[in-house]
Amino acid sequence: MLNNPVEGERYLAEPRAVILAPTRELVMQIGEDARELGKFTGLSTVTLIGGADYAKQLQKVNQRVTDIVVATPGRLIDFLQRRDMFLDRVESLVLDEADRMLDMGFIPQVKRIVRSTPKKEDRQTLLFSATFSPDIMNLASQWTYEPITVEIEPERIATENVDQRVYVLESRDRLNVLKNILATPEATSVIVFANRRDQVRRVHERLQKSGLECGILSGEITQAKRTKTLEQFKSGRLRVLIATDVAGRGIHVDGVSHVVNYDLPEDPEDYVHRIGRTGRAGEKGVSISFASEDNAFLLPEIEALLGQSLKCTQVPVDLVNS
C-alpha cells in the first residue's frame, strides 16, 4: 500500500484493504497489530466487531479516510447493508483462519463480502488456514487468481517449546487438581480451556468461590467485559483465564506459563491451537491435559494429528491432595 499510493481524491468508508477474521478477539488483536505496524506510515485502521456500539464504530469510519478495515464477517455485512461502507476500491483482501470461518458457518457471509470487492484479477487475495481441506481448496480457487501456496513447517505441528503432559484422572477430580496446579509457583500466567460455555462458567464460578481470582472468556460474555478481561490478563492483573476455543482464538499473549485442557478438545486442531498459547517468542511453556473417562477416547485423533504419542501419567501426588 505504501509502494502504491492512491492518486486523486479519496472518500470516506472506502478502505483499501479488508481483513476478515472469525472472532471478535482475533479482530481486535489484528487491529492492534496493524495500528502498531502502521504507526508512522499515515495508514489508518478501523476495527468492526459485533456486540459493540454500531454508532461509535460508524463515527470512527467517518472521522477520516480509512485504509485498513479489520472485521468480523457479520458486522461488515451490517455496514454494507446500510451502505455505510463500500468495498469497490479494495486492493487487498485477507481471509484469516478460513478453516475456522468454514467451521463456524461464516462462509455465506464471506461470499457476500467477496462479491462486493473488485474481481479477483484486480485485487490481491491472501487466504490463511491451518488446514487445506477440499472445501478450503475449493474456496481458494473461487477467490484467488493464480495463487501461490505457501506451507510453513507442516511437520512441526506442536512447538518444541511446550512440555506436553496428559494426566489420567476421574472427571470428578479435575477441579481439585486444577486448583493445585494453579497454586504452584510456576503457574504465573494460565489459560484453562473447556469445550462448552456452561463448563467454562462452572469452572470460573468454583474457582472464584475458592478465593482464586480469574477471568472468563466465552460467547455469552458481553464484548466490553471480554475486552476488559483480556486487557487485564495481558497486563498481568489477572493470572488465570478460563476460555472456550472460539473466544480463546484471539489470545496472543507472550509469557503464558501454562495451558490447561480441562476438557480434551473434540477437534484435534483445537488442541494444537490451545497449546500454541504458551511457549511463544522462544519461551518455554507447559500444557496439561486432563484425560478422564468422559474424553480419553479423543486422544488417538490428537496423537495422529501431532504425529507422535502423548505420554499419559497418573496425577502427581502433590497435585492430588486437597
Language model features: what each stretch is:
Residues M1-S322:
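Conserved helicase RecA-like core
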